[in-house]
Structures are given as C-alpha cells and as structure tokens.
C-alpha cells in the first residue's frame, strides 16, 4: 500500500522508485525438464524517456497475479563510472538475484554480448522463466537492444524478442519529442517512439484534452505502425503488454489488415515520420534485397533536399516473383528479414507490395519511384532518382 502523499508529484516520485520484486504465484511450477528447454522465452523491452513511468509499469506487472515466472532486468544508475544491473526472478516464493556490472548505462554497447549471455546463464542456473522484462535506460536506443535479441534468435537461442513498449510522459512528452539536438541527430525520445510496437501515453490525468490531442498527433506522425494506449500510473491490462508477438511471422492476412490502417504522416516539424505505399505486381527477390540494403546498409538514398534517408523501422507484405506465398519483410536499423507467410496469393491480379517505413528525412515519392524502378521484374538494379552517392555516417 502506498504511504500517505500530500501531492500528486510526491506519489509519482514514490511510484518511480525501484520496485520490490514480489513472488509470482504459479499453478504449474513443476514442469517436465525437456519441455522446459523446448519452449522459447519471450523478451519484452520497456523503454521511455527519464521519468515517463517505466519502473512504475514494471512494478505494476510484478504485483499482478498472472501465474507466470518473470525475470526482470532493472536498469539502475550510479554516481560512478560503473552501473549495477540486477537480474532477478520471483520463483516459488524465493528471490534469486545475480549482479552484472555495466561500465555505462546502455546495454547495447560495451556489454552487448555479455548481457545476453548473462540472461541465458541465469535461465540455465535457476531454471526457465515464462517471461523476461528488460528495462532500458532513459537515454538508450531500444533498436540496438532489440537487434541483439533478434540476431541471437537466428542463432537458435531459447529466448526471442516479443516486442518493444515505449512509455511517454503526457506532461513533458511533447517537449521531449520536439527537442532539437545541436548535432542534427534524432533525439532519444523520438527514436524510442519510432521503434515501439506499443506506445503507452502515461499520466493522462495531468494534462488537458487539448494538450493530449497534440501529443497524440505527434506520436502518430512519428510512428503510424505501433499501437497507442493511454494510461494513468502506467496501468493497463496485461494482455496489452505481454505476448505482443510483434516479430513473429504473422499470417499475410493479419498483416495486410494492419497495414491498411497505416497512412503516410503529414509533414509536420517532426524529424521522424511514417511513410507507406502500395505498388501492384510482384518484385524480383534479389532486386528487393538490393533496394532494402541500399536503404539500411549503404544509406545512399537521398530526399529532394539532398538529405540522406535514415530508415529506423521497416515492415511490409510483398509479392515475390515465382513464389506462391505472401512474403513478410521487416527490419530494425541495419537488420532485416524476408520470410514466407502461411498465406498464398489467390491469383496474379491481387499480387502487390505494401511497405511501411519509419525514419528520418523520408520522402514517399522518391521511395516509391525508387522501388518501382529498382525492383520491377524486368528491371536491373541501376542508380535511381535520389540515389547518387553514399551518405556520411551517422
């Protein structure tokens, strides 16, 4: 129970304190060992700007009775150069805890490999968990952290990335999202929203409806693909948070329905926008790979102002020549994959390529024309409009 608080701010400060991990009751804690090692464990990344309510969300999840064994990775800041990170799990009424010392506040940098190995070792030593929640620092890039798990899944790991949740503070979110960095780079809060599969607009009771509408519009213009929920004190139904399956090979039908609701964002003042287009017909697989690699790897595609386009997130449903299945493409930063769905195209007349890009300096017209020019079945890959030399590294 919360102690008596004199102000809303005091209550929020208490809620943001590091949560005390509580035992999670499980009905079936004794499972067969072999089955335990077959099931892959989902990892949900919880990110958001400092003070948005990430820790409050974790505390809420940990105190709910959902019959799961949950491992929690908490990000704690220290005054010195080293940061301690706690790996803990509530299991059978006992709290197991190990410490992994970090030299900076970002899991994806100097401890990229060790961080993942620590999770796997913890799982082997203490037994399997039903779920892992990873809280990133307020200044971390969740895309790099997500890539770590995505790559490891390809290597046969027994954990997989389930989704990214970004918590946004209603009161200060607009300020954070529109803040301009002197070096011209994308600010951390905007990047976190751009990469989210689920966006929680938190503390909605502290702002007016007008302020909330401005924040909604800004968030949707940055990320037209993620789901948006509004919360107070980071509380929402657990089904909205756990088991998102955002990176699974979705059926073509479900992805097609989702893409139909995504539209190109109006050009406001945001540095990151969502762009989408639909091109009828099929694509050559090799040409499609070159098109994506030029965007994600070579970064040599420019907009009308001569600025390099930076794709942070990519998702789409495409038709590949000579393949009966609908193909799903998705990517984060420099990683992408093209996989078969479980749905076949009914006939050639319905074949099409639907793509959604989230990123910086994006130009829909140039992207669409480049796609048509470079990926058409009868075309060879050539230098297309907007592709006239490598961009400088970011």
Curated annotation (Swiss-Prot):
Q: Name one GO molecular function term.
A: metal ion binding
List the EC numbers from the record.
3.6.5.-
First-tier enzyme category under EC? hydrolase
Q: Where is this motif: psi-PxLVp motif?
A: 16-23
Query: What are the GO BP annotations of this UniProt entry?
Result: intracellular zinc ion homeostasis; kidney development; protein maturation
Q: Which residues bind Zn(2+)?
A: 106, 108-109
Pfam families recorded for this chain? cobW, CobW_C
Identify the main location: nucleus
Catalytic activity reported: GTP + H2O = GDP + phosphate + H(+)
Q: Which residues bind GTP?
A: 48-55, 109-113, 202-205
Instruction: Outline the extent of the CobW C-terminal domain.
Output: 272-375
Motif stretch (CXCC motif):
106-109
- Annotated coiled-coil positions are none
| GO CC, alphabetical | cytoplasm; nucleus
UniProt keyword annotations, A-Z: Chaperone, GTP-binding, Hydrolase, Metal-binding, Nucleotide-binding, Nucleus, Zinc
* Cell compartment(s), UniProt: Nucleus
Q: What does this protein do?
A: Zinc chaperone that directly transfers zinc cofactor to target metalloproteins, thereby activating them. Catalyzes zinc insertion into the active site of methionine aminopeptidase METAP1, which function to cleave the initiator methionine from polypeptides during or after protein translation. Mechanistically, the N-terminal psi-PxLVp motif binds to the C6H2-type zinc finger of inactive form of METAP1.
Give the family from UniProt.
Belongs to the SIMIBI class G3E GTPase family. ZNG1 subfamily.
Put simply, this protein is called: Zinc-regulated GTPase metalloprotein activator 1
């Amino acid at each position: 129970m919360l102690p008596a608080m004199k102000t809303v701010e005091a209550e929020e400060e208490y809620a943001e304190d590091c949560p005390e991990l509580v035992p999670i009751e499980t009905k079936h804690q004794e499972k067969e060992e072999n089955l335990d090692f077959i099931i892959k464990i989902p990892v949900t990344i919880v990110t958001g700007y400092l003070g948005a309510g990430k820790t409050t969300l974790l505390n809420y999840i940990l105190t709910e009775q959902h019959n799961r064994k949950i491992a929690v990775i908490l990000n704690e800041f220290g005054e010195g150069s080293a940061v301690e990170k706690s790996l803990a799990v509530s299991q059978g009424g006992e709290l197991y805890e190990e410490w992994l010392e970090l030299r900076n506040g970002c899991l994806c940098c100097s401890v990229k490999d060790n961080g993942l190995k620590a999770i796997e070792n913890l799982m082997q030593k203490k037994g399997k968990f039903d779920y892992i929640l990873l809280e990133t620092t307020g200044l971390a890039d969740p895309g790099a952290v997500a890539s770590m798990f995505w790559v490891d899944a390809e290597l046969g790991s027994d954990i997989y990335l389930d989704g990214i949740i970004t918590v946004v503070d209603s009161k200060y979110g607009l300020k954070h999202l529109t803040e301009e960095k002197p070096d011209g780079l994308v600010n951390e809060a905007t990047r976190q929203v751009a990469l989210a599969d689920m966006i929680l607009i938190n503390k909605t009771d502290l702002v007016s409806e007008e302020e909330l509408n401005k924040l909604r519009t800004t968030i949707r213009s940055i990320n037209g693909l993620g789901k948006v929920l509004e919360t107070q004190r980071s509380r929402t139904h657990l089904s909205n948070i756990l088991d998102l399956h955002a990176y699974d090979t979705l059926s073509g039908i479900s992805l097609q329905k989702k893409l139909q609701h995504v539209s190109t964002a109006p050009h406001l003042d945001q540095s990151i926008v969502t762009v989408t287009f639909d091109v009828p017909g099929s694509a050559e697989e090799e040409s499609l790979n070159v098109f994506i690699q030029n965007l994600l790897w070579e970064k040599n595609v420019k907009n009308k102002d001569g600025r390099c386009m930076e794709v942070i997130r990519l998702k789409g449903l495409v038709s590949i020549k000579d393949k009966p299945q609908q193909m799903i493409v998705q990517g984060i930063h420099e990683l992408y994959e093209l996989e078969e769905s479980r749905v076949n195209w009914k006939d050639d007349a319905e074949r099409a390529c639907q793509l959604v890009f989230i990123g910086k300096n994006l130009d829909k017209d140039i992207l669409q024309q480049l796609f048509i020019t470079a990926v058409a079945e009868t075309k060879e890959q050539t230098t297309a409009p907007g592709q006239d030399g490598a961009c400088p590294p970011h």
